[in-house]
């Protein structure tokens, strides 16, 4: 065994003096930014949505908090942020968000003066001092006037919390004809200092985190903001250009493999001060590789010389590590078994609901759809018609999950958006990651809606459905006999007679509150949860409380417009997988539910049950 001075000769890294450049990887910060930008493009681990005008952008809270003091104060409690359209447009914010994730400012298709003036206004509003300094330098070189100081307009035109919670229901692609509503109107050259900006900064903060934000209440141009803009994408049909917002496309573009640099120790914080010197920005003739990140140049277009903010990429890494925190995890999703409890005791053995991994659009839930591939920045339809987007129309976005809560309010609390999908991402994301494997139903493709039980053939499903129907008819007709009603009594007698013995023997578990009976204890426990007074699962957006995590997760999809289950045939999206199963029968023409009295066939079980009630109701 080697010891003494010889050991140091074999281990030169044992002393601090030897830990020099050989132990650093200069491209580590670039690799980190590249990976973060790719994750944003795919929507992976994105935990905040920013709405600007009618455009939706997904991002990471940690990255926004490390780049802007303004965002840092908002993402503490909000998962949905609505920016003031008087201060920033969707096109400008696309450039700013690209810059935050790349550290590069590429030329846009707009004239230089209005674009930089607008960027300066938006950068001051979002408290991005580096971008503001860069815009001032560009305007100064061009001899254009600009505001002498940094504007602080954090509270001007800010919508209320209730306004921020509203989102449009129809998610559409951004078409090439879309233009900025503020295009052609120069941005205000100087805005008054906002006295109420602190109210905006600390809106909704709790006492626990108020001390964390007290040091942030300076002027709009904070000490540690980092921002900027990159090219303005216009949704060209070439597919090379991407808008890195929420990807609601049916298929996601493949993500080329990249080799991230090895992890290194945090860089020297002194880089931050170096990058904030208002010195002329050096130019570079190369942008990020097209294969490894979102492309910033139109197909067939010759890009102008890109601009780099000095040390921006290194500062991105320093700021991310300097925040001392990790991104908030999105809602936990775990695959649990699903039981359907209706008003009448109808239940079967649980059946594992599994995600098929397909993607598409939900039609209202069955009236909406997106047939085209949607870029990563998406447009929620507005009231204006015309153009390709007019075919989609506009609908209000009620919380339809709340209506479903009345039908299946006792679903398993462990059920959530993922419902057993891939381990790479939760099912409330609508994008595929590299290596994602689709999970199929196997042979049990015929699913009973109330109890979620699967069967390999429609005949077996019909036989199973009859047990539900007989039980419901027995309960209904039992009340009819007691009231002395005639007419359909004799007709329903054949159905109700065998169900009486069946229900007496197969439902030994009784609820202690309402005395309803169930087949198994698991279903009974789910029913008993409906009687609980406590609601431990709140919605992070509107604050509504739920007794079960799965119900709360589906409710949040209404706010975020996320519909993870899609039809491969037409691209329609659904928030619930059983609705996708029902919808697929529209394409196949299958009607597995048949009335035993008249022979009528139906695609959905609830239609059959309603039809049978017509037979048994007194005429």
Swiss-Prot record:
Disulfide bonds: none annotated. Transcriptional repressor. Belongs to the krueppel C2H2-type zinc-finger protein family. Hic subfamily. Residues 247-249 are annotated as: Binding to CtBP. One of its GO terms (cellular component) is plasma membrane. Self-associates. Interacts with HIC1. Residues 214-228 have a biased composition (Gly residues). SUPFAM superfamilies: beta-beta-alpha zinc fingers, POZ domain. Pfam families: BTB (PF00651), zf-C2H2 (PF00096). This is Hypermethylated in cancer 2 protein. Keywords: DNA-binding, Metal-binding, Nucleus, Phosphoprotein, Repeat, Repressor, Transcription, Transcription regulation, Zinc, Zinc-finger. Residues 180-293, 307-426 are annotated as: Disordered. The modification Phosphoserine is found at residues 166, 169, 197, 349, 416. It comes from Mus musculus. It comes from the Eukaryota. Residues 46-109 form the BTB domain. Residues 337-357 have a biased composition (Basic and acidic residues). Residues 281-293 have a biased composition (Polar residues). A zinc finger (C2H2-type) spans 446-468, 509-531, 537-559, 565-587, 593-615. GO terms for molecular function: DNA binding; zinc ion binding. Its main location: nucleus. It is found in: Nucleus.
